[in-house]
Amino acid sequence: MAPTMRKSHPLLKIINGSFIDLPTPANISAWWNFGWLLGVCVIVQIATGLFLAMHYTADTSLAFSSIAHICRDVNNGWLLRNLHANGASFFFICIYFHIGRGLYYGSYLYKETWNIGVILLFLVMATAFVGYVLPWGQMSFWGATVITNLLSAAPYIGPDLVQWIWGGFSVDNATLTRFFTFHFILPFIIAAMSMIHLLFLHQTGSSNPTGLNSNLDKVSFHPYFSFKDLLGFIILLGALAILSTFAPNLLGDPDNFTPANPLVTPPHIKPEWYFLFAYAILRSIPNKLGGVLALLLSIMVLFLMPIIHTSKLRSLMFRPAAKAFFWALIANTIILTWIGGQPVEDPFISIGQIASGLYFLIFVLIIPTLGLLENKLLKI
């Protein structure tokens, strides 16, 4: 009997091995759906972004007007713009759930997959940052000025580095043009890196909620999980459609409806909501270089996870003490997100400093120590 085409064709058998006959642990929950949803987000963002790029003009005198033109004059341009802007928010919601699941169930022990994932997070954050500058509103301009200025904290090369990125002595036309270039190319790099992420994942297979070896109990990805994933897909696209049509500006900043003006500083410069936790950590340290390092370390701490895993158990499912501190970390990150959106005054400064300290403490000290303690208590 001749093998089916999907198993014999050189290209189709790669797709078959990744999405159809892929052996998948039978007990994975809905938390394993987010990786697939991130793929959907990348496709939605690239599709809407391509059509927006056809009508956008990367010039300081025309950028703001070109966004207004897209929303008013282009067929369904308002929808494309809203889907793209809010799609970024859903992208980050999925990313944070995906990382949270990885931390909870010990997925970081697949080191290559995890490290590629953290690099992907940096790439997505860079893409979102340069994309936020493109409408050339007040918050776009001042956000770009403040964040790029942080590079001046680098010893010796800092000031030159900032001018090199700006393409001049301030954020101007050269900056906007290069940011548009980066915003256009980075999603394709993200798509390529996602393939590598999957390649490494399929070397080991998926983890599962118990953290045990699941080779004894696997089912094919299709039809079981392909249909199960459709539920998340419908919820994601449904929520994105509702937000983009009924409350498209809910997550945006009102200041961005004002064209960029280098002579007027907005009262509170803040990034989009998905960067607020890192922004709060940056602001909680009075020293500029210290703040920049803390900002970088708030994400780079994820690289340490496979190294500082001390427990003999993989998943937090059977680790009640560590589980409690995992949820404390989640609550702490939500507090940091809230603080990042508040003005720099007491009590927000001190709350931010305590929350920032706890963030690093839970990651690098409390959870690893609890791992050793639990090993002793369980005599393993």
From Swiss-Prot:
Under the cellular component aspect of Gene Ontology, which terms does the record hold?
A: mitochondrial inner membrane; respiratory chain complex III
**Membrane topology, as annotated:** Multi-pass membrane protein
- Report the Gene3D superfamilies cross-referenced here: Cytochrome Bc1 Complex, Chain C (1.20.810.10)
One Pfam family recorded for the sequence: Cytochrome_B
Which positions are annotated as binding heme b b562? H84, H183
CDD domains membership = cytochrome_b_C, Cytochrome_b_N
Provide the residue positions that the database annotates as binding a ubiquinone: H202
Q: Which residues cross the membrane?
A: 34-54, 78-99, 114-134, 179-199, 227-247, 289-309, 321-341, 348-368
Gene Ontology molecular function, alphabetical: metal ion binding; ubiquinol-cytochrome-c reductase activity
Q: Which PROSITE patterns match?
A: CYTB_CTER, CYTB_NTER
Name its co-factor(s).
heme b
What GO biological process terms does the UniProt entry carry, in alphabetical order?
mitochondrial electron transport, ubiquinol to cytochrome c
Record's cofactor remark: Binds 2 heme b groups non-covalently.
Residues binding heme b b566:
H98, H197
Q: List UniProt keywords, sorted A-Z.
A: Electron transport, Heme, Iron, Membrane, Metal-binding, Mitochondrion, Mitochondrion inner membrane, Respiratory chain, Transmembrane, Transmembrane helix, Transport, Ubiquinone
Q: Where in the cell is it found?
A: Mitochondrion inner membrane
Asked if Lipoprotein is a keyword of the record, the answer is no
Q: What else is known?
A: Heme 1 (or BL or b562) is low-potential and absorbs at about 562 nm, and heme 2 (or BH or b566) is high-potential and absorbs at about 566 nm.
Q: Which family does it belong to?
A: Belongs to the cytochrome b family.
Q: How does it assemble?
A: The cytochrome bc1 complex contains 3 respiratory subunits (MT-CYB, CYC1 and UQCRFS1), 2 core proteins (UQCRC1 and UQCRC2) and probably 6 low-molecular weight proteins.
Q: What does this protein do?
A: Component of the ubiquinol-cytochrome c reductase complex (complex III or cytochrome b-c1 complex) that is part of the mitochondrial respiratory chain. The b-c1 complex mediates electron transfer from ubiquinol to cytochrome c. Contributes to the generation of a proton gradient across the mitochondrial membrane that is then used for ATP synthesis.
Q: What is this protein called?
A: Cytochrome b
Source species = Rana dybowskii
The UniProt gene name for this protein comes to mt-cyb
